[in-house]
């Protein structure tokens, strides 16, 4: 029960003891039992549904801060209708202990599995050397390629990450050398109906062909494919690679070819098109430092930036001391949640201190970089590419946002990264910085966001490209799929890529796993205590 404020139109005077009209409660794991008992106080349990979004969060490790809470929620749960929603929910047969436990608690349980997949977008998987990867250019033996095709047929969500151009090239090769069985030739398979030839259908057709290629032909097919592969973003360099003769730019371009295109603030920036990029790594600080180092900012310019940052930091230190003095003068009334202007300060001393704080903040220097250093600005592209790439994504760091960041008590490294259009979600105590990065991510104004693998859950920011760091080689297959799901979430087909810094992660993605840590952990946690 609540009342509407006549002036503002807002909701006020809410009486939470009356819950008969409450139809939905959104809560986190720690609040679940409270929310459950509240809803049970006003509703028949058989008419309530618990919708558990992303139940595999935290299930990819043996120990996690949420495990105890999750176990208690499951053990004490009284609601017989439950939806577990996840793109990587383990198969039913892997969750039998959990299912049997649920059946033992509630009568007449009906189990329903709903599966869907979307492969109407093409998101290219790029390996550490810069090549576009599909099953047909990964596996040397026919047994391996056949097993992979069978696995992908069972898990069609993986088709989303098969590059359509590579698939079509492969099919054309098979057709040219008459390696397609008669009944699987395109005209027969698609029944001469051009309306059936869609992206989804082509990718399923591709899986069928992989399983029906003559086994004796596979060695020569694989050899041809490997020898004719080209890097997705290959740019020829017309100079001899000699460190004594080449400029920094030419050296960087040479390094780019050898490294698979990882110089994202210089030679490879133009390959990040249409929208922001997310870089997943557990070594967030290391990657951030790498991109500052590789940004080709001259020492004189960099020293000037550091000089201004040092001056700003000295001013911020004085501001912090004055704010502490002001808080004491006001009897610790001022807080982070209550901002006070000079007009509200009654003490003459408090007014004086407040004016000093304002004067000091006005002295904080705003910083910006010359466009020549900002990824994909025209001036930047004039250095790094022979022709302007119109689709190349450009960060947008306005002066007001830059000034807000400069005023924060924050590592200088993070401030410089933001000037480059790079935000960082690392563990640090400055909430204001995190909120600025979130705001800019939502507005698609950042070039790259560097974050840990746990960031993949619960974000709907739209990314066009993703880098998965080599330090994530032990990431589970299910979590890798979750990570890939951050790319291509809008409604149109653009140039999407997922770039892996370790090829083993790609192999793990496309091979049947002997164990499933998410399933094992769920079966361990989602079992009721004996006394329940």
Whereabouts are the PLM-identified features?
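Conserved helicase ATPase core of P-loop NTP-dependent helicases/translocases
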Residues: 7-15, 407-411, 420-452
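Inter-Walker segment of RecA-like/P-loop motor cores
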Residues: 1-37, 128
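Conserved segment of the helicase C-terminal RecA-like domain
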Residues: 79-81, 477-518
